[in-house]
């Protein structure tokens, strides 16, 4: 059934498999985890896919769903703790970097 929404999880590399799912007619979002650089690459990839696809395929690229595999309490504690941002790999750092990126896209 084509009404399935694909969450395309890739944590270690920004694999471009969203294109495969869109070509098959599925709506798809890429789902990064705790690596900010990979997550930002996935945002750029999704924008590129939308801009360089025909309208039929472009509509299937739904965006990004950030994955957090911790409880809300521990995530929020990390998010508001300044020492968290010294880490290169972190759920909280990834969310913060994605929010910064999204703010640059608002006027597009």
Regions found by a protein language model. Give the residues of each.
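Substrate-binding groove of N-acetylhexosamine-processing glycoside hydrolases
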Residues: 1-108
């Amino acid at each position: 059934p084509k009404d399935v929404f694909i969450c395309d999880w890739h944590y270690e590399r920004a694999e471009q498999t969203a294109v495969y799912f869109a070509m098959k007619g599925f709506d798809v979002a890429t789902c990064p985890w705790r690596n900010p650089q990979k997550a930002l690459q996935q945002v750029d990839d999704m924008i590129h896919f939308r801009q360089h696809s025909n309208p039929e395929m472009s509509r299937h690229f739904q965006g990004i769903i950030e994955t957090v595999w911790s409880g809300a309490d521990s995530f929020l504690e990390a998010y508001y703790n300044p020492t968290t941002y010294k880490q290169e790999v972190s759920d909280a750092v990834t969310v913060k970097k994605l929010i910064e990126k999204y703010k640059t896209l608002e006027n597009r």
